[in-house]
A protein has these predicted regions:
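Active-site charged/polar residues at nucleotide-handling catalytic sites that mediate phosphoryl
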Residues: 58, 80
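Mixed-charge, low-complexity intrinsically disordered regions
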Residues: 197-273
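Active-site signature of alpha/beta-hydrolase-fold catalytic machinery across serine-
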Residues: 75, 79
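Residue in the alpha/beta-hydrolase core beta-strand immediately N-terminal to the catalytic nucleophile
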Residues: 61-64, 83-85
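Gly/Ala-rich beta-loop-alpha elbow adjacent to hydrolase catalytic centers
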Residues: 64-73
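Short hydrophobic segments within beta-strands
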Residues: 9-13, 64, 149-151
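Active-site catalytic motif of lipid deacylating hydrolases and related acyltransferases
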Residues: 2-57, 177, 201-202
Length: 273
């Protein structure tokens, strides 16, 4: 029996898991897929931590983001190894927030009932820190697995040129920054279905990588350093004695530079034992 697909939706900065796009997504895939629409924390490191925890537990088959949620999805997709649809991605959240310093309210209900929040310099600096490294794990393998969807009437985010510096598939829809329910079902959902069809995730979720020096490895698990709680990667050599190795997750997935050339330290590959 085929396992039910799981979709993880990441909402925009002012939104929640009950925003219009989230509700439309749940309605569109009712009976067809398991849809997760969590409330994301205000602070970006907390949001990313929660998303990773959900990915560890629920093992989604695709990430779907809108605005700030797309900012998160782009960074997480190559690390967890699943395709992503980035709706109106906002890759410069610090600029967006700097013009809005002060007290605000979320535009859709939050499950904890807390609707008020404040934008301040510390929050802006957190986003700036992430923005400086947001494409560090972007790789050749993922170039056609992360799709962008851009509203032709979007007045807030204009990042299609930046998106196309890293990815190949750009789509458009006749709408603004936040799609209506009808627009979401008409334009987002067919692309989500196509991503699920074109890039199915292996049931065992085994992934293979090639080091830039040529050796190949199997990714075994994501783990935590018991002292620092830093994310680590456990991987096994597919040569020699098939030894197991551990290194910080960032050092495994990041892009490095050698002799003026930039490339992934470990490049994901299609490979069968």
């Amino acid at each position: 029996m085929q396992k039910e697909k799981t979709i993880l939706f990441l909402h925009g900065f002012y939104a929640s898991g009950q925003c219009v796009p989230a509700v439309a997504l749940r309605e569109a895939f009712e009976g067809k897929a398991h849809v997760l629409t969590p409330d994301l924390p205000l602070h970006p490191h907390d949001a990313i931590r929660l998303i990773r925890e959900i990915c560890d537990k629920e093992k989604p088959d695709v990430l779907v983001g809108n605005s700030c949620g797309s900012f998160y999805a782009q960074m997480i997709s190559p690390i967890v190894g699943i395709p992503a649809l980035l709706g109106n991605p906002h890759f410069k959240m610090s600029d967006f927030l700097r013009e809005r310093i002060g007290s605000h309210q979320y535009k859709s209900p939050r499950t904890d009932g807390k609707q008020d929040f404040t934008i301040g310099e510390y929050l802006i600096s957190e986003f700036e820190e992430l923005e400086a490294h947001q494409f560090d794990c972007c790789n050749i393998y993922n170039k056609d697995r992360v799709w962008g969807l851009f509203g032709e009437e979007d007045t807030l985010a204009h990042f299609e040129p930046l998106f196309l510096k890293h990815y190949m598939n750009s789509h458009h829809f006749p709408g603004g920054h936040t799609p209506t329910a009808e627009q979401f079902k008409t334009w987002y959902c067919p692309l989500i279905e196509k991503l699920l069809l074109d890039y199915p995730i292996a049931e065992d979720r085994v992934r293979y990588f090639q080091h830039f020096k040529g050796n190949k490895y199997k990714l075994i698990a994501s783990a935590f350093d018991s002292e620092t709680l830093e994310r680590m990667v456990v991987y096994q050599a597919l040569y020699g004695d098939h030894k197991y190795w551990v290194r910080p997750e960032k050092m495994f997935f990041e892009t490095i530079e050698r002799d003026g050339k930039r490339f992934s330290r470990f490049q994901e590959i299609d490979w069968e034992e």
